[in-house]
Regions:
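Short alpha-helical donor nucleotide-sugar binding micro-motif in glycosyltransferases
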Residues: 359-360, 367-372
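Conserved donor-binding/catalytic core segment of Leloir-type glycosyltransferases
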Residues: 114-120, 289-308, 314-317, 330
Length: 471
């Protein structure tokens, strides 16, 4: 079967190593970057997407997902290049096909051991909302004495809280996302050795591929629960490649739930959750209500362009400068864009207004937000930003982009402000408005706290998870 690969990046190179294990033959690589046209990978030429119009009966595998504003949406491939929906494949459609021929699934008898539940964190628990959520849910399971639940990750002694150390199994994947036969087989062997079991996944990785392949062979011995933390088209594509073996979905926002149902997932197996987090019973804090004082802006999270759009954050800062907004911007976090931000601050002599303060520990994040008037989020893809929820629980006014996750909690003009994705000009205008109308800080900040507080219910949350895991 003739196949085009759309996208010439890392995932394309990975697929080219596994195509020989599938019935597909790669006849070309497509990329939207003109600089790559005419070059080749493994002897296969890279061409313009226009080539798809001439070969619209061929299969097309979209190999990647990128930032949501640049991503090749399947609908666009249908409408613009006349590629039939049934001819569109994802990266994982190919990987599943290949590993059905590569993987070794040992034959075992019926296992009678206690059913155990494994939350996958095999890529490592660095900085990030998903990683924080995994540690938090383990804490709750310990607190509520929920047994037989374990976290799979690298037990390095630095990122694991003491209270959950005995709930962590030292299992990790080297170079997660590369899908080497050695690491995929390692995950397969783990699943088989621990049947019967439930695997709870928060991203598509080697453990998901392994659980899928084992469940195909032992459907009664393995249950798969997918927690969807993201809302971009590529993430939906990836997840739905495993649809036939996923027992339940848990979505971090109602918008994600609606989209999965729209894409063919049965409504009765799709659930939503609001993860609990600490907050004070009463909101006691101060705002920068005097016009002579600068507004205190805050950001907490990964310092990356991918999804978090730190490049847009810098453009926002320049617009604030242009509009002569009085502000101090405290940026908490770390990431690959950190050096670029530091250089930007130095080049524009902003060190008295823009401060990079590094990572803030989870138990100190409330104190961080209590000192900020406004919480900034410029992401182009958010499933449900934990940082934004934490900010609202501390009374910071959210000014955010219109992602599915942010709008789950932020209502424009009620408890914060929402602007279109990448629209840093409108965001700067909202901040300028707040500067000129300081009374809205207390009004919106208090409402943000009230609205977010109503959604937090640890007992209800644990009860929901117990039903999902044990019924």
């Amino acid at each position: 079967m003739q196949l085009y690969l759309y996208g010439s990046g890392k995932r394309c190179e990975i697929l080219l190593k596994f195509i020989k294990y599938t019935p597909y033959k790669v006849c070309g690589i497509i990329d939207s970057n003109p600089a790559k046209w005419g070059t080749e990978i493994d002897g296969i030429f890279i061409s313009s997407p226009q080539e798809l119009i001439e070969h619209n009966e061929a299969l097309v595998c979209v190999t990647f997902y990128s930032t949501i504003v640049h991503e090749p949406i399947w609908d666009v491939l249908e409408q613009k290049y006349r590629i039939k929906r049934y001819n569109l494949l994802s990266f994982y459609d190919i990987m599943i096909e290949a590993y059905r021929n590569i993987a070794r699934i040992d034959k075992v008898g019926l296992c009678n051991r206690n059913h155990r539940i494994f939350f996958d964190g095999s890529w490592g628990l660095g900085l990030g909302g998903v990683e924080s959520w995994l540690k938090d849910i383990m804490r709750l399971f310990v607190e509520y004495d929920i047994s037989n639940c374990f976290l799979l990750t690298h037990l390095d002694g630095t990122t694991i809280p003491d209270c959950i150390q005995n709930r962590v199994l030292d299992f990790s994947i080297a170079e997660s996302g590369v899908y080497t036969p050695k690491e995929v087989q390692k995950a397969i062997d783990f699943v088989i050795c621990n049947m019967p079991c439930t695997i709870v996944l928060s991203r598509i990785d080697e453990v998901m591929l392994a659980a899928f392949l084992v469940k195909e062979n032992y459907p009664e011995q393995v249950r798969i629960i997918m927690v969807d933390h993201g809302s971009c088209d590529g993430m939906y594509r990836d997840i739905l490649s495993f649809k036939s073996m996923i027992d339940k979905y848990v979505c971090v926002s109602s918008g994600i739930k609606k989209e999965l149902i729209k894409r063919g997932v049965a409504e009765e197996i799709v659930h939503t959750m609001t993860a609990p987090m600490p907050y004070e019973d009463n909101l006691i804090r101060k705002y920068s209500t005097e016009f002579s004082k600068p507004l205190k802006l805050g950001y907490a999270g990964r310092l990356e362009v991918f999804e978090k759009r730190m490049d847009i954050l810098l453009k926002l800062i320049m617009r604030l400068e242009y509009k002569h907004v009085k502000y101090v911007f405290n940026i908490a976090g770390s990431g690959s864009y950190e050096a670029m931000i530091q250089r930007f601050v130095y080049d524009n002599a902003l060190d008295n207004r823009v401060r990079l303060i590094g990572n803030v520990e989870r138990d100190k994040i409330s104190s961080f937000w209590e000192k900020q008037d406004i919480a900034i989020n410029v992401s182009d893809n958010e499933g449900r930003p934990i940082s934004n929820m934490e900010a609202m629980l501390s009374g910071a006014v959210p000014v955010v982009t219109m992602t599915v996750g942010a709008t789950e909690d932020v209502a424009d003009g009620r408890n914060g402000y929402v602007v279109p994705i990448c629209d840093y000009e409108s965001m700067a205008e909202k901040i300028k408005y707040i500067e000129l109308h300081r009374d809205v800080l207390c009004k919106l900040g208090t409402q943000a706290y009230i609205d977010m507080k109503k959604k937090i219910n640890p007992k209800q949350y644990v009860s929901m998870w117990c039903k999902l895991l044990y019924e």
